């Protein structure tokens, strides 16, 4: 479920040594499955352990995960990185905003998962996003751009060289292309 690097484990052991005996860490997701999902790590005293928590054993401590957060923390990683600017704990949870779909899910569900977990986070740096409108009978993913992508002068390059290439590589034989149905209006909201 959650991978914690050796450096992060050592960091947690050190932090927990200053806490009352029996204190664990809790890894959680606030608003899981939404665009506003946020992950966190906190102390978990013994009296805060719930009956439906999942307990994951590590060397020197245990991590608690509440039942609601658990499916959204699949494939999550925690690391402790040190560089010339200092040290930082990082938590990456690719499924926090949307639960990972199974390999036998419908094509639209699998594409929607890739959009939410991989493509939209990249577009968010420009204030943009895309939404899957439909998949046509001939395998065309019909997409609509929003936010900073609406009216951006680079939208065609983003669509063909970025999004289409990525989706066709991931869904060979199932998807034949992508189409933008956005009524682009360049304005202050547009990235370029």
Swiss-Prot record:
Cofactor note: Binds 1 [4Fe-4S] cluster per subunit. The cluster is presumably bound at the interface of two monomers.
Cystine residue pairs: none
Keyword Metal-binding listed: yes
Essential cofactor(s): [4Fe-4S] cluster
Transmembrane portions of the chain: none
Gene3D superfamilies listed in its UniProt record: Fe-S cluster assembly (FSCA) (3.30.300.130), HesB-like domain (2.60.300.12)
GO biological process assignments: iron-sulfur cluster assembly; protein maturation
Residues that, per the record, bind [4Fe-4S] cluster: 149, 152
Keyword set includes Cell membrane: no
Keywords: 4Fe-4S, Iron, Iron-sulfur, Metal-binding
GO MF, any single term: iron ion binding
Record function comment: Involved in iron-sulfur cluster biogenesis. Binds a 4Fe-4S cluster, can transfer this cluster to apoproteins, and thereby intervenes in the maturation of Fe/S proteins. Could also act as a scaffold/chaperone for damaged Fe/S proteins.
Family from the record: Belongs to the NfuA family.
Subunit-level organization: Homodimer.
The protein, known as: Fe/S biogenesis protein NfuA
Organism this protein belongs to: Shewanella pealeana (strain ATCC 700345 / ANG-SQ1)
Origin organism lineage: Bacteria, Pseudomonadati, Pseudomonadota, Gammaproteobacteria, Alteromonadales
Gene that encodes it: nfuA
């Amino acid at each position: 479920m959650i991978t914690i690097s050796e450096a992060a484990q050592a960091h947690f052991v050190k932090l927990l040594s200053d806490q009352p005996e029996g204190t664990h860490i809790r890894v959680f997701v606030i608003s899981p499955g939404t665009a506003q999902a946020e992950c966190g790590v906190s102390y978990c005293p013994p009296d805060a352990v719930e009956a439906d928590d999942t307990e994951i054993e590590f060397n020197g401590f245990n991590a608690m995960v509440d039942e609601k957060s658990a499916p959204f923390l699949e494939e999550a990683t925690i690391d402790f990185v040190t560089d010339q600017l200092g040290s930082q704990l990082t938590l990456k949870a690719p499924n926090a905003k949307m639960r990972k779909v199974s390999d036998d899910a419908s094509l639209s569900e699998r594409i929607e998962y890739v959009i939410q977990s991989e493509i939209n986070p990249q577009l968010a740096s420009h204030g943009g996003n895309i939404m899957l409108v439909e998949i046509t009978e001939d395998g065309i993913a019909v997409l609509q751009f929003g936010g900073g992508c609406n009216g951006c002068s680079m939208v065609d390059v983003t669509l063909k060289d970025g999004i289409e290439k990525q989706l066709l590589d991931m869904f060979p034989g199932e998807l034949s292309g992508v189409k933008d149905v956005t009524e682009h209006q360049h304005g202050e909201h547009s990235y370029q």
